[in-house]
From Swiss-Prot:
Signal sequence extent: 1-18
Compartments where located: Secreted
Propeptide boundaries: 19-38
Organ and tissue specificity: Expressed by the venom gland.
Protein name: U12-lycotoxin-Ls1d
Swiss-Prot/TrEMBL keywords: Disulfide bond, Secreted, Signal, Toxin
Molecular-function GO term, any one: toxin activity
Organism domain of life: Eukaryota
Family as reported in the entry's similarity comment: Belongs to the neurotoxin 31 family.
Post-translational modification: Contains 5 disulfide bonds.
Length: 93
């Protein structure tokens, strides 16, 4: 009987703790942070010239030669660009 009470109490504490963690996660929306604080930019977002690691994931590389846009923006990488970024060892995911 004591075991059942302790188990039930533990489950209640675990449920309350997990709800508070989820609330904290919702408060911090990564899209609201500037690029420098996020660590990387999503596709079609501004990036740092010459730094493919400034684009998130293995799919994104920084492109500064877009014919219709001034500046540098993340684009979807081709096969060779993906391999080059993989070997570069970028820390962001």
């Amino acid at each position: 009987m004591k075991f059942a009470v302790i188990l039930l109490f533990s489950l209640v504490v675990l449920a309350v703790a997990s709800e508070s963690v989820e609330e904290v996660r919702r408060e911090i929306d990564i899209e609201d942070l500037p690029e420098q604080q996020r660590g990387c930019a999503d596709l079609r977002q501004p990036c740092t010239e010459g730094d493919d690691c400034s684009c998130c994931g293995s799919e994104g590389v920084c492109n500064c030669s877009h014919p219709h846009k001034k500046g540098c923006y993340c684009k979807t990488a081709g096969l060779l660009e993906k391999l080059a970024k993989k070997f570069k060892g970028c820390k962001n995911k």
